[in-house]
Amino acid sequence: MEHIPEPDVAWLRDPGASVNRLTVHSTWRSRRPLQMLSSTWQVTGVSGTAAELIKRTPLQRDFEATSVPGVLEMDGAWVRREEEARRAAEAQGEPAPDQVRASILRREFILDAPPKDASERGWTMTLTFGGFTGPLYVWLDGIFVGFCADGFIPAAFDVTDALQPMHTHEISVLLMDSPACCHGLFREVSLEARPPAHVIDVIPQASHNGTSGSLRLRVEFSEASNTSTIRAALLGEAQQEEIWSASAPAGEDL
């Protein structure tokens, strides 16, 4: 997938747009290094043209605390600030037609030992937003990561090249107001490390009567790991009895 390095206001005109977003996949339990980035974030409400807000977001420094996951309309302090901003705008007269409201959210974090070790070994690092409302632009360490018009299903971005060699990292999010509903990062945010050879999707399919089924795995591997062997096993309900297993070199059918 070609990476687009700069944000564009034109994406806001396409309700189905997503930029640099990884392919949507099913969810399964994994032992990959995973760091949760929820809890306390910082937030501020802003107004201006979309182009002005995009330029401003990675540089913004005036914030107050909020909770993630959360809906901003349920954050009392945020609601009061928004009401004050609305009154101030009304006092200045009719806003320009290209003026928009948005929220800038920010989170600083230090990599935990497992993802830090994985990053130093060259593993792929992905940043996932479990759910959000309103168009979202995101930066990591000041580098544009991606855009998604809505996030009612998880949106993941490859941030391997965006992670800078520094002790403290910073996520900046521009979340445009949505006139249709409340907005905010309403599900978990996480950072995951993926090894050179890893499963990217699990697609099970069963017959209507449950007597047969199939499982398709989508596996991604780098040039350095193209000699890897894939092994799959089907276990009983107690996960002790191995009902079926098979193995094959990467790129071949099991």
What are these regions (language model features)?
Residues 153-156, 250-254:
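Aromatic sugar-binding surface patches on proteins
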Residues 69-71, 78-81, 179-183:
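Glycan-recognition and processing domains
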Residues 1-28, 42-48, 95, 99-201, ...:
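Accessory beta-strand-rich segments of carbohydrate-active enzymes
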Residues 29-38:
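N-terminal helix-cap/turn-to-beta initiation motif at the start of protein domains
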Residues 40-77:
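Predominantly extracellular/luminal regions of secreted and cell-surface proteins
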Residues 138-140, 213-250:
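Beta-strand-rich binding/interaction modules
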Residues 80-97:
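Surface-exposed, low-complexity/disordered Ser/Thr/Gly/Pro/Asn-rich loops and linkers
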Residues 206-213:
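Short, solvent-exposed loop/linker segments at the N-terminal edge
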